[in-house]
Amino acid sequence: MGAYLTLIYGVIVIAALVIIGLIKFIFAQDKGNEKMQQISDAIKEGAMAFLNRQYKTIASLALIVAVIIVVANYYGHLSEGSSQALSFALHVGFAFITGAFCSALSGYIGMYMAVNSNIRAAAGARSGLNRALQIALKGGAVTGLAVTALSLFGVATLFLAYGGLSGQDELIKEAPSLIVGFGFGASFVALFAQLGGGIYTKAADVGADLVGKVEAGIPEDDPRNPAVIADLVGDNVGDCAGRGADLFESTAAENIGAMILGVGLYPIFGWKGILFPLVARAIGIIASIIGIFFVNTKDESKDPMIALNKGYFVTTVVNLIALFFAVKVMLSGHLPDGRPVNYLLLYGAVVTGVILSYIFVFLTDYYTSVNKRPVQEIAKASTTGAATNIITGTSVGMESTALPVIFISAAIYIAYKLGEMAIPHIGTAGLYGTAIATMGMLSTTAYILAMDTFGPITDNAGGITEMSGAPEEIRRVTDRLDACGNTTKALTKGYAIGSAALATFLLFSAYLDEVKKILGKPIDSWFPVDIGKPEVFIGAFIGAMIVYLFSSTAIRAVGKAAQYVILEVRRQFREIPGIMEGTAKPDYARAVDIVTKGALKEMVIPGLIVVVTPILVGVILGKEAAAAFLMIGTISGVILALYLNNGGGAWDNAKKFIELGNYGGKGSDAHKASVVGDTVGDPFKDTAGPSLHVLIKLISTITLVFVALFR
């Protein structure tokens, strides 16, 4: 085990050193003129103020939940003896606090780097496209590497502390079950970070657009708009802090779920089957570092997306090569009858996961790109009014769920069968195959997250150049990067929901394993869920309902918070003379403060609904009903998230397609109709949709933590 631990912690150290180097590179860059710095400072101040207040709210809720976890697990394990029950409960409670802290820290790092990179990317645009591209991507890379390294460090350290280093088989096998609290803590913070950030960003965006662009007739990012700084702050709190916590949770949950499944194969692989997910994560970090340094564009006229795709391709190739050797060395055990495990089939599961990630990126691009049929259909429908825009956009969103579901299903089936063929006649072999496929898909997480954070950095850079009155040639550079950033944000949402779907299949399987352990059944036996029982049917019904109820409250929260912003912007236009003439400065801080309070107030109820419901289902209706709740909740959540993400993205880009000069261009009736569709789609793609990625993993980790209480 020593050599593998050296590899894991060695990679964490390398990631830390690279992060330090990237931070030094970014902070050494020029910060532009005084006006640019003033705008950047206002964005930074607003973003960090929101994050600090949000984390105070989350921390108070997390402490209450930690106490409930300890008490629930103590009483749930009392049959094993008082001292053993207390030890188990404290281990799970501490893991929850650790996961919550690491998730919050990853969000903080993402936010801090974004608000310090945006001004430097804007200033770098004066030296050309490549300089600005390098600054923005490396700012995003700090987030990507920090999130994945923190996740790896947290899971690995807890595993070792909870028995992984003991040398005793029973303690090593028990350790993954004790660290499920880490996944729940990560999920808990991620839900509120994504939800609160999503409400903030869309409330500010909708408020700024409706009063600024529609009522006052001023352009986007115009310094006369009192909500413009709040809008730029929103780009960071939703896409940096929120997505950072989301993918931190995905990697942590996938690692823990795969480690629990590895316990079932202990007679064949020993501790290597449990440790393999951590080694795979370490390999992914190194591959992402290599890919990041391959990104550059010597030809300034080329689409910067080509350079980013090159880095993604390099990351994938390095991953595939390194994971082949990892599978060969770690998963080449022997079956009970003496035959060797076919590691090539297990490697096939890795390739399946990698291919699925590419397919998801391609499908998301197809349904949200201005160059493709779906978006152009919505743009054409806008020529006959807002109603036909909404009807066509809804249709596109619904259509966009079909192919992703088919490919997810195919990937799960193929990976499951490859696992069964590689390790025949072992009950959990197929599930381990799907775990390996999930590792393949998530192996590029650090690079994907770098691309995602690249989006808000370039968006802010464009806003800063616009508000500071920078020359037209600099704005052209930042506009090209901003367009590229919009693409990366859309693509990473597709990647996030695909990885969430695979990760939750693992967690569902891990839940069934935990139930078998509690019932004293062999780990390779079956836990039957009788769909004919009314409790099971009711649990499934509630699982489907909770997804829609949560989305409803999240979307409504955006509407309520946006009303606060709209009223404030109207008040300032009315009461502060000279704003429209440019002779008086709007009160940006007031608008930021109002949307901050509104977002934090509105995020609590949707979040609590998700946390409480699965516990009540398990306690009142039982373990089988909780399993049905998980399965149907996951299926409904994935499909609805695809609809919301892709539908919202398509509405957004239909507006951009018209703004390029099609169907009358800006100011035309078609453009006005497309603005309505874009406004409807905003809370879909940036609030409810991304929050569902977290929800489907959260309900799985909650049931894992509280399963001992279920009847």
From Swiss-Prot:
Q: Which GO MF terms does the UniProt record name? A: diphosphate hydrolysis-driven proton transmembrane transporter activity; inorganic diphosphate phosphatase activity; magnesium ion binding
Membrane-spanning residues: 7-27, 58-78, 85-105, 145-165, 179-199, 251-271, 274-294, 311-331, 343-363, 403-423, 431-451, 495-515, 535-555, 602-622, 624-644, 690-710
Q: Which reaction does it catalyse?
A: diphosphate + H2O + H(+)(in) = 2 phosphate + 2 H(+)(out)
Q: What is this entry's stated membrane topology?
A: Multi-pass membrane protein
Binding-site residues for Mg(2+) 1, renumbered to this chain: D205, D209
Chain sites annotated for binding substrate: K202, K685
Binding locations of Ca(2+)? D652, D678, D682
Summarizing the function annotation, the protein's role is: Proton pump that utilizes the energy of pyrophosphate hydrolysis as the driving force for proton movement across the membrane. Generates a proton motive force.
User: Can you name this protein?
Assistant: K(+)-insensitive pyrophosphate-energized proton pump
